[in-house]
Amino acid sequence: CDTSRGLSLELYPDLSAADSAATYFNNQQANSFDIIAHDSATNTGDVTFANWQWKANGGTRTTFSESGDNPGGGYQANTAAGFSIVDYTGTQATGTVAHGLGDVPKCIWVKSRGSTRSWTIYHHQMGSPAIEKNMHLNTTAAVTDYNAEYWSGTNPTTSVFGLGNADD
């Protein structure tokens, strides 16, 4: 759940599943949210839960338009913390996507929210050259070479990251 997609959708980092309905949270505050007390998936007694939370910029989304093969979408960026949440509509063509960081990202996670696809990960120290490497968060597979289909062979810059034509 996040302020880009809203409290009604969830993603699991260990699964390739698409967005799914979440009914566990309500009443989002500036710095917190309420958990629905009667829900067994998020508030069962004697069960340990983890919830990851990052505050991007309070819910203000900056939009960008599609231009040729470069997807349109938007982002929320917290430049002080060094992360952004980016959403875009893919073109299945090689292009670039704005990230709003003002610095070169060292790690990028991409997930198709509308279909069952893997989490595709870039990390600047994955190998040489890192931009030609790929791994999937939701599998145990090793880092692989990918021939530019994921990151287009284009290193991230202070304003954009590259996308290839992979359908993952």
Feature map (PLM): residue ranges:
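Surface-exposed molecular-recognition determinants
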Residues: 1-168
